[in-house]
Amino acid sequence: MAPPSVGRKSKNISKGKVDARTLKRKRVEEDLEKLQKSVDELDAKAEIKNFSELPLSGPTSSGLEASHFKTLTDVQSKAVPLALKGKDILGAAKTGSGKTLAFLVPVLENLYRQKWTELDGLGALIISPTRELAIQIFEVLRKIGRYHTFSAGLIIGGRSLQEERERLGRMNILVCTPGRMLQHMDQTAAFDVDNLQMLVLDEADRIMDMGFQTSVDAILEHLPKQRQTMLFSATQTKKVSDLARLSLKEPEYVAVHEAASSATPTTLQQHYCVVPLPEKLNTLFGFIRANLKAKIIVFMSSGKQVRFVYESLRHLQPGIPLLHLHGRQKQTARLDITSKFSSSKNSCIFATDVVARGLDFPAVDWVIQLDCPEDADTYIHRVGRTARYGKVGRAVLFLDPSEEEGMLKRLEHKKVPIQKINIRPNKTQDIKNQLQNMCFQDPELKYLGQKAFVSYAKSVFLQKDKEIFNINDIDLEGYASSIGLPGAPKIKFQKGNDAKNVKNAPRAAIESSDEDSETEKKPKKKDEVRTKYDRMFERRNQDVLSGHYSKMIADDTPMKDVDGTADADEDNDFLSVKRVLPVDNDDTSDDEDDDDDDDDDDDDVAATGPLGKVIEGISKDPIVIDSKRKEKLLKSKKKLLKLKDRGTKLVFDEEGNPHQVYELQDEEDFRAKGTAEEQRAKFLEEEAERVREADLLDKQTAKDKKREKREKRKAREAALDDDDEEALELVDAGDDEDPMALLKSLPLPEDEEDEDSTARPAKRPKKWFEDDSDDERKVAKRKGRVIEAADEPETLEDLEALAAGLLN
């Protein structure tokens, strides 16, 4: 027989592959039909303890087993069966009860049963209030969904927007925060949510709160109405308005611990202690020093308090690693700090409520609430960072005496068992003097302390529950002294909006609106010449606290409205003194700024307005800001110096008492010293005595000068006498002596010329027209008169005549 052809064999192979694909597709469809049938037959009210008892797909079961999830918690056993059937769910359970898996497993299963692929677009959207919680949910999703073929993405702020845009259109499951999700819905053209099947809100009561109200409403407008919605939180909302906004259809309320005697885990030991506000830092430092081998979370009201306490205690070196986390940090820093605290065995982290919800830090021993939480729900979420998954944990709440009664009522209403403890005085450590020393040596730390003080006072003032938070019952002066400040900063409180609306408003939206309004109002500045002095004043220190320092001492802060409409997140409102007074239309107080010739005519129009702003404290008289010229005046340090009071010069007497340079007496003091004639006579006597003393001093000075001159003359004469002793003496010549000996000893003019000639430079060479006679005439002219002796002197008269000629 002839061998079979090669073409026929290839056709058989390709046909076998097609048959294998077809069989696999049929097998998958059969499995899906069985799975769907099992889900339909599932009894949602049945008690299920293990994941293996649920009708789950193979990839999900493998992912759960690989992640070591085998047993269901209470909330999972009740919520997962309902979610698999496609029901809308309102889930409420204690912190650390496994709510994350209760919605992630149904998300994977429902998309798997619908054969969801990359081409189908976005199938599930999971929204969390904070970035850290979104990252944690995404990591759990990656673990249990590792065997699925879905594409999942994490959309949070602080990351590259362009990279997210490029990948967003291919995602099947998204974990996000509200702000960044809304930004992509408005700006990313390739992002489509029309096929969305499931919407999950983790920590739903926080997301539906007024802080995210605008963002969530805008997101819901983009989403389709036909979808499955699940809400999970430890403190679930039941407001009809919130549920109507989400378009829930016959939602199932799952509250496994609603009938429990406590809203917190039973393994959590909860205590509170009454500590006056000025003593809180001392108590906290003593507590940290006593628990160096523990893992501690300390909650505070604001990020500025977190910064100040961290920077202060870091210098004191308590003996345990310190970390701090707040919402104003960069995303990379927040991730780094979160991972460090999670992996550490013993450390202390100072944080705001940004870590109060959902985050799962392993093995947290203590949760310390340095500041009173705004409500009982916030307290429950804060203490939920410890005692998770049945483990033991401890929590301590520091309460001011004015906060004790009201807060205990709120906790009792929420079924929170808490016991009072007393702190021994010897367990606290007084760090007041050390903080004062640090603030004195480091001005930037002092200004950061002022910002922390203002931020805390503002947070108390803006709280809605006045039964707990009353700014008048708090010792602000003592608190300022306890954090090292020389005195309490002056704060002018203004009426603000609702506390949560102000506190939880998105900062990005506030900043963008402020920038837009500034750009509309302020015209573009002209290009001006910048001198070296301008650059010198624009320099700033690049320190870790330089930003806080510059904000506290900035004198060119833009003025804000005084009707309470300014941004409540800014602290400058509380540090400035402003009021509104009527100003006459004919006010002409612009004398200082008449040299500004390049101002427009609309400045004068603005000056005729019915109202003006009055600023006190800069000069002796209040400054009325009723025109644009006056507003520009506030930005010029040179012009403000003209308005400030000039200093007065003082002189100090021998005892150190200050006096004015010119002090005038009144009439009574003058008469007390006597009549005018008596004072005149007394003045003349004093002046005469002063003149006599001055004469004596002058005479003594003259005598001293004469004596000094006489001593100098005597010294000079004595020096001359010494020279004369060395000179030659003239005596009568005897018969044996040569009469020419004296004259021969005297120097002759020729010798002097020879001596001088030795010191002079060499003569220049003669020219061709010069001869010796010319040289001799020049020498004779220079030497002057020369005595020529024709014959040698023989008698004494001849010698005397020769000597007289030489001497003359």
Curated annotation (Swiss-Prot):
Gene3D superfamilies: P-loop containing nucleotide triphosphate hydrolases (3.40.50.300). A motif (Q motif) lies at residues 49-77. SMART domains: DEXDc, DUF4217, HELICc. Residues 280-439 form the Helicase C-terminal domain. It is found in: Nucleus, Nucleolus. Its EC number is 3.6.4.13. The keyword Magnesium does not apply. It catalyses: ATP + H2O = ADP + phosphate + H(+). The Q motif is unique to and characteristic of the DEAD box family of RNA helicases and controls ATP binding and hydrolysis. PANTHER family: RNA HELICASE (PTHR24031). Interacts with the U3 and U14 snoRNAs. Associates with pre-ribosomal complexes. Belongs to the DEAD box helicase family. DDX10/DBP4 subfamily. This is ATP-dependent RNA helicase dbp4. The gene is dbp4.
